[in-house]
Amino acid sequence: MAERENRRDRRDDRSREETPEFADRLVAINRVSKTVKGGKRFGFAALVVVGDQRGRVGFGKGKAKEVPEAIRKATEQAKRQMIRVALRDGRTLHHDQEGRHGAGKVVMRAAVPGTGIIAGGPMRAVFEMLGIQDVVAKSLGSQNPYNMIRATMDGLKRESSPRQVAQRRGKKVADILKKPEAEVAEA
């Protein structure tokens, strides 16, 4: 009996250790209203970005009558919808990328060390929660924070590491990273 309890305690400890601590960022909070027979009912909608700052990020929307409840719902949804993104040297993207959602378009570029996060509003929150330190991004089209975050996430989902590209093409990573002979001759 004691041995069984001991195992359970170890399992509980392990699950607590394995659960990474997530950072979250409130991107937008809107007061919304619903017109009913007796007048207007007010509520709140929250948009939250959650990440472990080591390559995982997610976003969520939550609606409730009170702000803290809306934020809690959005945070829970964001944790359920997390994606993993391959980062180069744990600080930037592997390649330039474009993401789209609705009328929103986002262009993201890998940057050299020391550049910092050059991005506006909601995109900056996504990059910070993801753990990216150097990136240049530009939002074109819709400036709606929901569309900007979805477009950013679309671009990040398309991001692939040299290992993933090599695996897809059936080649070695060294072949993918090697410069073609024509470029070497010009330089």
Swiss-Prot record:
SUPFAM superfamilies: dsRNA-binding domain-like, Ribosomal protein S5 domain 2-like. Residues 22-85 form the S5 DRBM domain. GO terms for cellular component: small ribosomal subunit. Residues 1-20 are annotated as: Disordered. It holds the Pfam family Ribosomal_S5. Keywords: Ribonucleoprotein, Ribosomal protein, RNA-binding, rRNA-binding. One of its GO terms (biological process) is translation. GO terms for molecular function: rRNA binding; structural constituent of ribosome. PROSITE patterns: RIBOSOMAL_S5, S5_DSRBD. HAMAP family: Ribosomal_uS5_B. Part of the 30S ribosomal subunit. Contacts proteins S4 and S8. NCBIfam families: rpsE_bact. The N-terminal domain interacts with the head of the 30S subunit; the C-terminal domain interacts with the body and contacts protein S4. The interaction surface between S4 and S5 is involved in control of translational fidelity. With S4 and S12 plays an important role in translational accuracy. Belongs to the universal ribosomal protein uS5 family. This is Small ribosomal subunit protein uS5.
